[in-house]
Structures are given as structure tokens and as C-alpha cells.
Amino acid sequence: MPEVSLYNYTMSICSMKTRLAMEEFGVDYDDKQVDIGFALENFEPDYVRLNEKAVVPTLVVGDRVVTNSYNIVLEAAKLGKVGIPADPVENKAALDWFQKGDQVNFQVITYGHKGVPRGDELLIARRERAKEYAEKYPELRSIYQAAHDRIVEHGNCAYDADTVAQAEVDLQKRLDELDAHLADKPFIAGSNYSIADIMWTVLLARIEMLNMTAWISERPNLLAYYQRMKARRSFETARVMPNWKGGI
């Protein structure tokens, strides 16, 4: 297997998904931390040349670069040759629920619930850094300008009450559906752990981090499932965080 490096940040929800995939699917990797807090390391030129969106995570496999946690989890399953069931029914369930989790707007929910310490200040700092670097590095201006515009749009959405409320409604519908789905299954796809469990273990941990645990505990099948996932060794080794740790 070629050398594998994962650029990530401990408290990033998307980074947690990829670390959990690496641990569960048995992929050895070099853990490269990129501080996306006030250090703003994700805006440094060397990093944006790897990931033009200036976000984490980023996976490098040999000379290939894979961005977006969705793609990285799939790549980890491919490298580990596990996580995507061969059985057609379980395969469909794994992919369907993996996609359903990815569609939930947890970024808006997290910032809307003030889940990131000094989150308001951080968004301003990111916006200003992108603007500054667009002038400082003219060869990368279009990348930094696009990053600036995404940060502005994210801030507008994250602090719009209607947008946050709709994201919460969408999430609760998914949780109801998943609770019913888990009535007779140890894992989301069925009898085998899959990419769907990667996705939802991390999303449920984020719900806990946001002090919204009632959304889990009031759904008995979901609660039992989450407890099983938390008991897996990978939950700790992948640093899936149900509570905020450290600064920003």
C-alpha cells in the first residue's frame, strides 16, 4: 500500500468521520494535524494547494489527493477492502444511509447552537484571513476569494433562525427513520459494520456534544445503537469527540 497521510483537525466533525474510517477499516496513516482554529493553518498556501477549499480533511495516498470526507471514507473502505457490504441488500442500505447522513447540514446546526467556542469570532477571522491572503498571494487569489465567499455564505446561513430550524427538522426526521430502521439490526446495513456506521456514529456524537442528547435517548433503538458504537475501541482511538476538548 502506498504511503497514506490524513490532514485533519481533532474537533472537526468531518475529520472524525475519516479517522474513524481509517481505524475501523485498518488503514495505517500518518496523522497530520491542521489547526483550523485561530491558527488558521488551513489557509496557508501549501495547504490550499492540496485542498483548494481550505478545509479539512484531506487525504493523500501516494501521489493522489482525495478531498471531502464523503470521498475519503469511501477511499478508506477501498484501501481496507471492507466497509461496503457485498450482499446487495446490505450494500444498498449502507450506501443509502451513508448518503442520508451526509445530507444533514450539521455545520449550520453546530454553529447555530454555538457548538464551537468563540465561533462568531472564528468565522470573522477566517473571512479576514481569506481576504488578506487573496492580496498577499495573487497566484492563489481565486482560491482565497472563493473561500471568502463560502465563509460569508456559511455565516449567513448559520445565524439565520429559519435555516437552522429547517436543518433541525430534517435531522429529526432522519433520526426517526433510523430509529425504526434499527429495530432488528445490530448495524445500519444489517449484520455487518459499514460506511453507514462511520457516518452515523460521528453524527450522533456531535448531537451529544451539542447537548441535544434527548434527541437520541427518546429513540430507544437509536440509543442502544449509539451505546454499542461508543463501546467499540475505534471510538476512542479515532478520537470521536462527544464533548468539546481543548481551545480553538
Curated annotation (Swiss-Prot):
Gene3D superfamilies attached to this UniProt entry: 1.20.1050.10, Glutaredoxin (3.40.30.10)
GO molecular function: glutathione transferase activity; trichloro-p-hydroquinone reductive dehalogenase activity
Domain GST N-terminal: residue ranges: 2-84
EC number: 1.21.4.5
UniProt xrefs under Pfam families: GST_C_2, GST_N
The GST C-terminal domain, residue ranges: 133-248
Effect of C14S: Produces 2,3,5-trichloro-6-S-glutathionylhydroquinone and dichloro-S-glutathionylhydroquinone, but no 2,6-dichlorohydroquinone
Superkingdom of source: Bacteria
InterPro entries per UniProt: Glutathione-S-Trfase_C-like, Glutathione-S-Trfase_C_sf, Glutathione_S-Trfase, Glutathione_S-Trfase_N, TCHQD, Thioredoxin-like_sf
Catalytic activity field: 2,6-dichlorohydroquinone + glutathione disulfide + chloride + H(+) = 2,3,6-trichlorohydroquinone + 2 glutathione; 2,3,6-trichlorohydroquinone + glutathione disulfide + chloride = 2,3,5,6-tetrachlorohydroquinone + 2 glutathione
Coiled coil residues, start to end: none
GO biological process terms held by the UniProt record: pentachlorophenol catabolic process
pH and activity: Optimum pH is 6-7.
Induction (record text): Constitutively expressed.
Pathway: Xenobiotic degradation; pentachlorophenol degradation
Keyword annotations from UniProtKB, A to Z: Aromatic hydrocarbons catabolism, Oxidoreductase
Family stated for the protein in its record: Belongs to the GST superfamily.
Known role: Sequential reduction of tetrachloro-p-hydroquinone to monochlorophenol, using glutathione as the reducing agent.
Subunit relationships: Homodimer.
Stated name of the protein: Tetrachloro-P-hydroquinone reductive dehalogenase
Protein's organism: Sphingobium chlorophenolicum
Name of the coding gene: pcpC
